[in-house]
């Protein structure tokens, strides 16, 4: 046995160790169900397996990282640790909405695994049809389990659970692209290209805000490494299995990564078709036909297997009207999205892309720029049919943009013989600029924090004010006072709770509920307000709440015209004296004053219909979310 093991490669020994670890976990899970150690150990195993898979992909893609590559990689990872530590420690950010979803899922996954291993894995499987699956929690539990389990802890732990595999694959992708472009100055190419891509602000933007969606980039890079220079000239079953695994992984990470998958597959098939046509014209029609046949057979088999594997998700996608339900977020279509993409990429990056396009044209190497451009265009068109992107959804376009950055880096590196100092200063300035970018919920243009705070245009002064308030809170003490008041005046055992009308980035129920994670002081004591048509139901809990909280002025941070909390607040203010009396008031210290109103008269049909009638347009679009909800509540309360 020892002789067999000794003959295995290092990677083979790693996989043997992982298999032994998996067996040990199965035995441990059966022997000690509900152990607090089981989920962290599973997470540690998953991270090790993911890293081993990344190394296996590099080997299959024919990429080998030498000592220089590894030194740069480790140095950049160490710099990322310091960066995250500094950024998270220099702000007071309160996690809410999408920024708290994964943290809550991590808590829920921990609670499920605390019951038993079966309950934990069942919890993960049951989430497959949700907008936020629990797939990532398998990888983020370790080392999160060793931390204080705050929101900042969750963001920081991603540097250890997500970033190593991501950087290894990005380094491999950089080497692969350099080889395909026949770069001569490989030292500077890798240094410039790898650092340029790794520091691109929208790679880390969501992670700094508590959203580990960049986890999907791991599988995107795997897919690109396995396919960029592969032309189906022969049958390669191990590669096919890895491509399938990478595709499944990226879809399980976030459903909207499907737009990248579709866009990339379309661009890749188009590239392969063009190369096959050229091959046929060069006198090799048989080889060209065999290429396309293998591609079609693999594509059909992979698509069929993927549908079977992700059948619950496929059913949800086919049965749910995403364009209708998410229409609120489609506030400008492709025209506005193109403008947003332009602002996010920025002038410095477009200069690099321009250099890359000129470089590719001169060397007659159009494949990679065309592949990236086609992928971006298809993904962009498909996504904007449903909605426009937020900063975290920008991740589905990141692989295409990074590919263009690498082509530009090749041009910059191979052109260093001329104007060397200017070009190196351009690279250095861009790195400093990129690292200094503020990662805020309101970030539209990637700018350093000091530039945002002192932006000279008065037209954006309100944006700057709100950006400061949401990114680095100065009202934590005031929020805690409101929390303490609600906690003292609502008895959860009696079913008492408060309802909050404001549902805005500046103030919403999540801000108050999750102000002191992992402690959730107002668990079951604070209900969220209505805001997004197609997402939020008619809020019948308003009529059950002991207290209603509103604010003056009502927070409305760059909301679209169809936003609902403003309308509800106006209706409440016009009729509140008939059913409520003022109970308390809180000055938040930033121009906003919260007022607590206590219900004095129980809700009746007339009050419910008063509010429902004001949402006739929404009711016509979503009756199952408005009139049907209201009527069911009225019937349940004998009204």
Segment roles from a protein language model:
Residues 89-100, 114-138, 157-160, 205, ...:
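Membrane-proximal lumenal/periplasmic loop motifs of glycosylation machinery
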Residues 55-58, 153-184, 222, 354-361:
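Transmembrane-helix motifs of polytopic, lipid-linked glycan transferases
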Residues 9-10, 70-74, 187-191, 241-245, ...:
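Signature aromatic-anchored transmembrane alpha helix within multi-pass, membrane-resident enzymes
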Residues 1-86, 290-301:
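Start-transfer (signal-anchor) and selected internal transmembrane alpha helices
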Residues 130-169, 190, 206, 346:
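Loop-to-helix entry region of an early transmembrane alpha helix in multi-pass inner-membrane enzymes
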Residues 202-215:
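Short acidic/glycine- and proline-prone juxtamembrane loop motifs at membrane-interface regions
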Residues 465-500, 505, 514-639:
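C-terminal luminal/periplasmic domains and tails of membrane-associated envelope-modifying transferases
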Residues 102, 108, 260-261, 265-271, ...:
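Transmembrane-lumen/periplasm boundary regions of multi-pass, lipid-linked membrane glycan transferases
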